[in-house]
Amino acid sequence: MFQDNPLLAQLKQQIQENLPKKEGTIKATEKGFGFLEVDSKTSFFIPPAYMKKCMHGDKVIAIIRTENEREVAEPQELVEQMLNRFIGRVKMFKGKLNVVPDHPQLKKMSLKAKTKKGLNPQEFAEGDWVVGHLIRHPLKDDNGFFVEISEKITDADDKIAPWWVTLAENDLPNSEPAGIDDWQIKDDADLERIDMTHIPFVTIDGESTKDMDDALYAKKNDAGDFELTIAIADPTAYITPDDEMDKVARERGFTIYLPGRNIPMLPRDLADELCSLIEGEIRPALCCTVTVSKDGVIGDDIQFFAANIKSHARLAYDNVSDWLETGSCEKWQPSEEIAAIVRDLYEFSQARAEWREKNAVVFPDRPDYRFELSEDNDVVAIHADMRRSANRLVEESMITANICAGKTLQGHFGTGVFNCHAGFKPEKIADVVELVNPEGTLEFTAESIATREGFAALRRWLSKQETTYLDNRIRKFQTYSEVSNQPLPHYAMGLDIYATWTSPIRKYGDMINHRMLKALILNKEPVQKPDDSVGEELALHRKHHKIAERNVADWLYARTLADAPENQTLFTGEIFDINRAGMRIRLLENGAAAFIPGSLIIDNKERIECNGDLGTVSIDKEVVYKLGDVLEVVLADVNQENRSLVAKPTQVFAELPVVEETQN
């Protein structure tokens, strides 16, 4: 009788129009109900029946009404859906395709699905990893949620899943670009390459490195100063800005480095062969010579030039470090000529490091964590590789080279691809001063730390403190590093200018700087200048690559440490973040990040306070942990689904003494 009654529908619409509406984000719970979060302080209950119209993370407009004496939200209009393109796993339900999103809050949702044209649904099995697209949504007047599968990533039990799934999730390629059959050098007709094949350049890399992009030569003169020459591989000899390969390189931005494998920016036949500075092979290179004084000061005689060079020795970090640190190496014994060059390079690097420690900023030594994989992609071991003397030798050479490029590009063009860092966020400077100089007895003022020199002086002071507590707190007040086409300073390094050109096989920005430096050599206009968007593009690429690297590592850590809770394996953790729920630590043995909830420190909410602003954890109002502290922990839980670790301190805090009542 009332079905399809237009008057009833009109009345219902009028009632709804008069009800208050709120816009917010859906927060789902495991119990079927949810909440509309309007802001950090306001939320409304959503009953299970209404939650069927939406999913966690959807941004919606909802009607607020009173039901059973309680304000509830009924989602009415979709502002922005949480899922668009996403990664999921196939679930078969009564023989039909469904997809479960690979997201912690959505793993209980099984969404009906179909394959796109050209994909055979018979080739999909339970648990397979896929790329899905949410094409129907109940709040769009569709009949339920519906997914189209556009790609199968890999089989359910494939051990390559951590890499392929993570790359697909971030929409990143999982292989190098296709090469071409016949690479030709396309130098400007006026570019003269100096024959430097007789100069005994050396390369120093990891044992397994194939894309060797820098070769070094140094000679100490009679005054004790160092004549340094840096030769860098030259892919822009083969790739012009108009080439299709240049577009591919720009789209990729960087070589992607993931635990256990990398995805090159350029084809491997170029990166690992034609451009790689292989021992005994003649290669085109872009070179820089400069004199560095015995006190570590970079001279004004910076010169860039094109050359043909030949590496005279392919050296490995560990072998060179052993030889420098102990005077001998079982695996490697240099000739007199190579020994002299390595010794001069080492002395140069010590002079530069000393100069930077006094005048700029030197980052503290932290290990590089390296996953060793079997052929079946199982983790065999996780190594903590400390940076040794040979690593520092190469690092100082590259920093020197990049300072030279920065000065040259700034002086001649006023533009280039520069790495920059603006120091502290302007609105946080007063907080920094209050933190480090509360009594006003130190040199650090709001005016001084806003300058590059003052910022560097503060960082040097922080590095000399007994604990890293202040350093950890202050990091939250710093800006992020950026890439810019303007010559701006790099506060975090304590340098006036910094422009990288030493890894053009792996970084597109370095290719642009190569073209700029070649224009300087030719005294011509550059064939390519960095446009205003290149910095943002490269920063976005770097962000996605970092996320992918972290996600793969988290997955591998969860796999590798699965038995640690049962075995009660002891680890050493360093606290790097504290919030009101607990603290985050890094396991120093392997680099894994783990969360310690407050309840696993002491299971009494009244006694514990985790203060994110102060970076402290207090029990009974007494600070027991703070940022930078190191503590012994065991893993309480390893969640394979969410790829997360939960840890627990081994330190047990005493119960409060029971106060007995006395009778009068």
UniProtKB/Swiss-Prot annotation:
Residue span, RNB domain: 193-521
One GO location term (cellular component): cytosol
One record GO biological process: mRNA catabolic process
Keywords on record: Cytoplasm, Exonuclease, Hydrolase, Nuclease, RNA-binding
GO MF term set: exoribonuclease II activity; RNA binding
Gene3D superfamilies linked: 2.40.50.640, Nucleic acid-binding proteins
S1 motif domain segment(s): 568-650
Enzyme Commission (EC) number: 3.1.13.1
UniProt-listed InterPro entries: CSD, NA-bd_OB-fold, RNase_B_OB_dom, RNase_II, RNase_II/R, RNase_II/R_CS, RNase_II/RNase_R, RNR_Ribonuclease
Compartmental location: Cytoplasm
Pfam families: OB_RNB, RNB, S1
Catalysed reactions, semicolon-separated: Exonucleolytic cleavage in the 3'- to 5'-direction to yield nucleoside 5'-phosphates
Function: Involved in mRNA degradation. Hydrolyzes single-stranded polyribonucleotides processively in the 3' to 5' direction.
PANTHER family membership: EXORIBONUCLEASE 2 (PTHR23355:SF37), RIBONUCLEASE (PTHR23355)
Entry similarity comment: Belongs to the RNR ribonuclease family. RNase II subfamily.
Name listed for the protein in its UniProt record: Exoribonuclease 2
Gene: rnb
